[in-house]
């Protein structure tokens, strides 16, 4: 789900996410073409660490849902996802990481998010208790960013998705020590 763009330092960036046009050449280099339909760009998390953790859960097949605040969408003039939308998900460096299709969207008060959705999000132990604790902390930071006060009844966008494409992760650069070992 879209979140505040984050800089390479892990500090929330006030800059914009890249555009679909910016990302398409990179996707095409990996042989990825997008299906017809509405395409947008989004990110998960509000720090480099959280972004990487959530993307790893998606890549592992554990995470198939994301939650965001209606207030955040309003503050950022960002539409609420709709079923069938394609999303290019970027990492904390604004590099494309994966492509998803939204399969379900429900807007509910924070205190009405279901255990089934919490499990679909795939974070922590998958329980509603874990979801509420961690998302309360996350949404509290989001509320601070947009000048709102968190509430048990704040509206949450619960979106489910399927992964269409995983963008290959770049290989780590070889170190001098690695080259010396390989030459032996």
Where are these regions (language model features)?
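Mixed-charge, low-complexity intrinsically disordered regions
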Residues: 2-99, 106-184
